[in-house]
Every structure is written in C-alpha cells, then in structure tokens.
From Swiss-Prot:
Belongs to the polyribonucleotide nucleotidyltransferase family. GO terms for molecular function: 3'-5'-RNA exonuclease activity; magnesium ion binding; polyribonucleotide nucleotidyltransferase activity; RNA binding. Its EC number is 2.7.7.8. It comes from Thermodesulfovibrio yellowstonii (strain ATCC 51303 / DSM 11347 / YP87). PROSITE patterns: KH_TYPE_1, S1. Pfam families: KH_1 (PF00013), PNPase (PF03726), RNase_PH (PF01138), RNase_PH_C (PF03725), S1 (PF00575). Mg(2+) binds at D491, D497. Its main location: cytoplasm. This is Polyribonucleotide nucleotidyltransferase. Residues 628-696 form the S1 motif domain.
Length: 710
C-alpha cells in the first residue's frame, strides 16, 4: 500500500505493508534516491506514576545506504553520532506534544536511512515517516504532523533545497506543523529579518498541509483502530485534597524571588501533602485499596496544582515567579579574561543562569574530522556545551554528554557560525567550551552570549557580536502572554520555548517548540518583536564589557605564519620519508602544516623566536639560486672534473675544474677539500634548474670590490 505526492519534480512516496510488519506501525518514506524506514512500537500495558510521555526516538544512518563501509577496527556502526542524535531530537520535538494526556505506554520510534541520495532530505523524511507510522498505527496520536526545509537564494524561498541549493542559501530552516499551525521551528540564517522568518513559516506551512493530506490518505487505506488509553482515576480528587491542605500557602512559596528558596518552600509543601494524603484512609477512599502507595500520584497532582497557580498569576495578574514584568530581562553581568592561561574566557551571568565559556585556538591538526554519508568533513569551529549537575544543586555522576547537551551545543554553535571568520581570514581551529555553573532557564542562550565575549577576548575577528534570549508563552483561553527571558519553571509549565539568537542586524539561529496545538502568526510576530528588543538590550550590556575583538592574541595562543613557496619545493621541505620536516619540528618545537597544491606552508608556535627560526630554515630550503650572485658554499663532493658545492640548503651546483682558479689545475683535491667553505658565483642555471658555479670569477669580483674600497 502506498500513496505519493509530487514535490519539485520528484515523488514523495509513503509505503506500508512490506517492511517490518510486526510493529504497531511501519512506513517506508521515499523521495528520489533517499529511503527512510520508520517504525513505531508501543508496550501493551501502561506504566504507572509517569508525568511525561515515555517516548524514545532513534535516528540511524546505515553506512551501506551511501555505499560505504564504516571506519574503525570493528567496521560496523557504533554509538550514535552527533548528527544522529540531533536528528533524533528533531523528530522527537514535533511528535511528542501530539500524544494525548495520560498516555503512559512506553513507545519507541526508529528512523533508519536505507538509501542516501543527494536530496538533503533524510531528516525531513524521518519526521514525515515517523508521523505516518504513528498515524496508521493503533497508538493514540493527535497528528499527523509534517515537516519541510526552507532555504532562500536571491530573495526567493526554496522548498527542500538539495545539497547544491543549500550551499548558496542564506537560510536553513526546518519547519514542522499540524494541519492547523506550525508547532516546531529550527534553523539558522545569515542575519535574516524577523519579517523574512514569518514569511518563511507561511511558505512552509502551505506545503506542510499537502504532506499531512497525504498521510491522512494513507491512514484511510491502511490505518488501524486506535487503542483506548487506560488512565488511572483519582487525579482530580487528589488535586482538590491538595488545595484543601496547602491552598493558602502556595502563593507565598511560588513567588519567592530566589530559585533555591522557592524550590525548598515548594518541597516542604509537597512533603506536607504526602504526609496528609498518602494514608490508609485516603487510599481506601480513592482506590478502595489501602495498601497502594500513591506518592507518585500525589507528586504529579501537586505539580499540576503549582502549574495552574503559576499560569493564572501570569495571565490574570501579570506577575511572574521572580516578580518581573512579561518583557523584563533579569540582571546581567559580564566578565572577560578571568582565566590567565586560557586563550579567551568569559563569565556571563543572567539572573540565576551562569555560563563560564573558554575559547581555545589551535592549528589545522586540531580540526575535527567528521565521517558522514556525504563523505569526510573537517570542522574548524566547534562549540561544546556541558551541563554540570551542581548548576541545579544536584548530585549526579559525570558522564559523556547527553542528547540535551549535544543539542544545546549545536544550537549555540549554529548561532555563532555565521559570524566566525573564514579560514583564509583567520587560519585557526577554534574550540569554544561552555560550562554551565548555574541554571534557571535559557542556559543555551547564555552560552551564545558568553561564547561571543570569550571569542572577542581571544582576539577572534568575528563579524559581529551575537546574543540570544529564550522566549515563552502562557495561553489560557483567548488570553496570551509572551514572556521574555524565561525561568526554568516558566519553560516547564509554559506553552512555548522559543530561542532566538542574532546580531544587531538580524537573526542567526532560532529554535521553537510549541506544547499546545499551535500558535497564530500574530503571536509569533509578537514573540519575535520582544525577542529583538531583548537581543539588542543584551548586546548593549555585553558591549559595556567588550565591544570588539582584541587586536592581539593571548601570549599562550599559537601564532600561525604563512609562507608561499613553489609547489615543487614542497618535497624539499618534507624530505625523504619526512626527514627534513621532522628535523625542523624537533629543532624548533613548532607545528608545520603543508598544503601541497597551493604551495602554502603554515608554521604555528606560541614562541615567536622559534617560529621565526623555522621560517628561516624553510626559506633557506626553498630559495633558488640567483644568476650572478656570489654565495659562500660548502664543498660536498670532489670528482675528477671538479666539485659539487652546496650554496644553500638542498641546492648544489657544479664547480667545474676549469672554474676553480685562473691557473690550470691538475687535481681538484690539491686545491679543495670536502667540507671546505669557499666563495662561488652562479654563472649558469639551465632549463632543468641545474646550477653551474665559478670560484675564480667569485674571487676576481671580491678582489675588485676590495680594491675599489681602498
């Protein structure tokens, strides 16, 4: 069974009934030569006590899909790559909000790339395919949802740009939505305007609706009846009981200005509820079973009560938990150069969110090699985000970065990538690390701000400073409030998380997730307007600390020097088996990188004298003999017809016996000795570059110069 839709001259095909038939839902999504198998499976029984949708999404790229064999010793796919993690998150975000309340069945969706073409669409197909698989399955799902990518070339929007179009595009936007509205946005841009972004969403949604209609057609042909959700009763009764116990105390606890104090007060209220409600009498009344532990049910109901209080306070009273107005930004402090041995460092604090950001400059040896289905990619700019457990007062083991950390780091990296200088302008590999020391909302945007400060402190000539802010939304009926610089609580209990980063001129990165059925373009415009005001305010605050990149690099950063040589001279620098270049490195301690085709030699060292020494050695190796010039050369070999003299490193010339002296010489060894330093003049360089020397002309010229001086 399959349905199809033509997009840009190629068919989007959704096929079911052939692959993976033991799943709850399975769809093969095809476009051009790109095939993605999308499957969903849900457990048959629910899990009790969950306050979230137990959904796991995994995206995997099979090496065989691009005709490749994986590298490494084992020659098979290993742990998920960063790209696979990022696409997994991209699929998850528009799908998760569409599961109904009370859905407690563990569910897994897997998107496997089986064939990889040059359409640049595997991630988009995965979102469409997972949604289609859920739509035709028996799993309750308030979809379907669809996605497209939007590019922009010469001020025209392009739907699902291929690899060639993507290279020219100034916009890279993934938009997902339902039939009614856009629900997820992620992308980057070369300083685009807010108006352009809104128009891009409208353009995207027009095509999203066509793909949703295609999924509904597939559902009509092969959809299964949806299973009923077995929900546990008693939640409303528990909420009423909670209000009877602590109703008069919630407001005082919820509106304490500090996060730690607020959380402590709320924890005390929760404990009071647990002590009063997790009793035999209440359990018997609620479930007819006094042995049942209902602490999880009480905790979940308590969370809903607090959520309702916070939202009503914002919508009806205009009061946020920390006392701010809806468009007010928390206090900001910026510090730079705080770590003496680090090439660039900054501490950015916004309210109770704090990022310590460090910049390290390296050479081409430090570039990150990324294996992808499209081939090897070398990254010269990297940003890594670390969320440390103490930042929220927790005790957790330190492990490898999780999905959230990789996603936040990528968002911040994307925001800054548009202002990072090209390799020709700044020949360094740049690594930025953001360690979150405190967190109460918007740590990824604090990373963007801190990274900008750190890069400028390191002397990286970025095109413009970048700042970011997280926006939120509370929607109750017809009333909506857009929040600027949201707290963690406002993110958790709110209806939207919208992160916007950019320069003074425009937006460079954005990420939006809507937890409700969608938002209108009017609300979206308002959020963008508030975000721009906040961004400009933050940029101004950052400029008070540092307004442009430092002119000098850190004393401890490597200096990179470029030398242009003839490409044919590269082999002389390297030497047989790398002997010459290794010798230079051992003697000077520098790093040397050679671009063979261009004839560019890069020398890197934090010690300027060592770098200059290496430069002189390389210049000596690559310089060519100059006709008519006198050199002090070393006799390297004596032969019957003359001698070979090295006039510069790697350059030898023939000194014929007739050119040794004015008088006739019987044996060369009577006049010259191996290793002897003698003056010689270059008298000929033939077409093959062979050099002929004359000692007698050199002596004669030196004698004439001396006589002239006296």
């Amino acid at each position: 069974m399959e349905v199809e839709l033509e997009i840009k001259g190629k068919k989007l095909v959704l096929q079911t009934g052939i692959f993976a038939k033991q799943t709850n839902g399975s769809v093969l999504a095809k476009y051009g030569d790109t095939y993605v198998l999308c499957t969903v499976v849900a457990e048959k029984t629910p899990k009790e006590g969950l306050d979230f949708v137990p959904l796991t999404i995994d995206y995997q790229e099979k090496a065989y899909s691009a005709g490749k064999i994986p590298g490494g010793f084992f020659k098979r796919e290993g742990k998920p790559t960063d790209r696979e993690i990022l696409v997994s998150r991209l699929i998850d975000r528009p799908v998760r909000p569409l599961f109904p309340d009370g859905f407690n069945y563990e569910t897994q969706g897997i998107a496997s790339v089986l064939s990889y073409g040059d359409e640049n669409i595997a991630d988009i197909l995965s979102i469409i395919g997972i949604s289609s698989a859920l739509t035709i399955s028996d799993i309750p799902f308030n979809g379907p949802v669809a996605a497209v990518r939007v590019g922009m070339v010469e001020e025209e929007f392009i739907l699902n740009p291929d690899n060639d179009e993507a290279e020219k595009s100034i916009l890279n936007l993934v938009v997902a939505g339902t039939e009614e509205a856009v629900t997820m946005v992620e992308g980057g841009a070369a300083e685009c305007s807010e108006e352009t972004l809104v128009e891009a969403l409208k353009f995207a949604h027009t095509h999203i609706k066509k793909i949703i209609a295609l999924q509904k057609k597939l559902q009509q042909l092969s959809g299964k009846p949806k299973r009923e959700i077995i929900s546990l009763n008693g939640d409303e009764e528990i909420q009423k009981a909670i209000l009877n116990i602590i109703g008069g105390k919630i407001e005082n606890a919820l509106f304490l200005p500090k996060k730690v104090e607020r959380q402590q007060a709320l924890d005390e209220l929760l404990n009071e509820c647990l002590q009063n409600l997790n009793t035999e009498e209440f359990r018997q009344k609620l479930y007819g079973n006094f042995d049942k532990d209902i602490s999880l049910e009480i905790t979940n109901a308590f969370d809903k009560v607090i959520k309702k209080f916070m939202r009503e306070s914002i919508v009806k009273k205009g009061i946020r938990a920390d006392g701010r107005k809806s468009d007010e930004i928390r206090p900001i402090t910026c510090m730079i150069g705080i770590l003496p041995r680090v090439h660039g460092s900054a501490l950015f604090t916004r309210g109770e969110t704090q990022a310590l950001v460090a910049t390290t400059l390296g050479t081409s040896e430090d570039e990150q090699k990324v294996d992808s289905l499209e081939g090897e990619i070398f990254k010269t700019f990297m940003l890594h985000y670390n969320f440390l457990p103490f930042s929220v007062g927790e005790v957790k083991p330190l492990r490898a970065p999780g999905r959230r950390e990789i996603g936040h780091g990528y968002l911040a990296e994307r925001a800054l990538s548009y202002v990072i200088p090209s390799k020709d302008e700044f020949p360094y590999t740049i690594r930025v690390v953001s360690d979150i020391l405190e967190s109460n909302g918007s740590s990824s945007m604090a990373t963007v701000c801190g990274a900008t400060l750190s890069l400028m402190d390191a002397g990286v000539p970025i095109k413009a400073p970048v700042a970011g802010v997280a926006m939120g939304l509370i929607k109750e009926g017809d009333k909506t409030v857009v929040l600027t610089d949201i707290l963690g609580m406002e993110d958790h209990y709110g209806d939207m998380d919208f992160k916007v980063a950019g320069t003074e001129k425009g937006i460079t990165a954005f990420q939006m997730d809507v937890k409700i059925s969608g938002i209108s373009y009017e609300i979206f415009k308002k959020a963008l307007k508030q975000a721009k005001q906040a961004r400009l305010f933050i940029l101004k605050k950052m400029a008070e600390t540092i307004s442009e990149p430092k002119k000098e690099l850190s004393l401890y950063a490597p200096r990179i020097y470029k030398i242009q040589v003839k490409p044919e001279k590269i082999r002389d620098i390297i030497g047989t088996g790398g002997k010459v270049i290794k010798g230079i490195i051992e003697e000077t301690g520098v790093k040397i990188d050679i671009e063979d085709k261009e004839g560019i030699v890069k020398i890197a060292s934090s010690n300027e004298s060592a770098a200059q020494k290496a430069i002189e050695i390389i210049k000596g190796i690559t310089q060519e003999a100059e006709l008519g010039r006198i050199y002090m050369g070393k006799v390297t070999r004596i032969v019957d017809f003359g001698a070979f003299v090295e006039i510069m490193p790697g350059v030898e010339g023939l000194l014929h016996i007739s050119q040794i002296a004015d008088k006739r010489i019987q044996k060369v060894s009577e006049v010259l000795k191996t290793g002897e330093q003698i003056p010689v003049k270059v008298i000929e360089i033939d077409e093959l570059g062979r050099v002929r020397l004359s000692r007698k002309e050199a002596l004669r010229e030196i004698e004439n110069r001396t006589a002239t001086k006296t």
